[in-house]
Amino acid sequence: MCPGGYVVSAASERGGVVTNGMSLSDRAGANANSGLLANVFPDDLPGDDVLAGVELQRRCERAAFAAGGGAYVAPAQLVGDFLAGTPSSAGGRVAPTYPRSVAWGSVEKCLPDYIVGTLRDALPRMGRQLHGFDVADAVLTGVETRSSSPVRVTRGADGQSVGVAGLWPVGEGAGYAGGIMSAATDGIMAARKVVEALGGGVAE
């Protein structure tokens, strides 16, 4: 969650739109922004290929590119319209911060139905816990598809890759974390495994 933050472009492939969030050090932006995440299980993926998660990611990113009309404009929808299943035609009190502009419409067209359903269920629940989180004219800007790795590098009980000795897959890129805190925690655990493998003791 980024207080006083901005939604930024994070695309790395031609023809795909990817969003992310950040704050500058003064956290003085007009908005707060937060990524909305949904579980994706192996049975949800389009096929059994090891890169099926990457394919799902690309489908969403390409759909967002098309929904934005090209030029890496991001699709956007008001929360109230999203919950009602209605495309948005204009913004409200909350101004979007995505730097390449937004195209008002329907972000749900960029996502699989099971993710849309999860988000529609979660937003009102979040609003009950965090007042204003589901306010009707809050802005959904899509899509954030890079919060977690779509693949996982398998590691053994010693923390090393099962295929390459001496390699410790760690954090988000290896598929073991989905954010700053979980990545830091995984890094600490991996560091302990490295010290143990090198014959050192680990203080508790």
Q: Positions of the model-derived regions?
A:
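Short C-terminal domain-edge/linker segments immediately following a structured domain
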Residues: 66-71, 184, 198-202
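Active-site-proximal substrate-binding core of FAD-dependent oxidoreductases
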Residues: 79-82, 193-204
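Catalytic cofactor-binding cores of redox enzymes
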Residues: 84, 89-99, 111, 115-118, ...
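Generic secondary-structure signature for well-ordered alpha-helical cores
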Residues: 88, 124, 128-132, 196-200
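A glycine-rich dinucleotide-binding beta-alpha-beta segment and adjacent secondary-structure elements
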Residues: 102-177
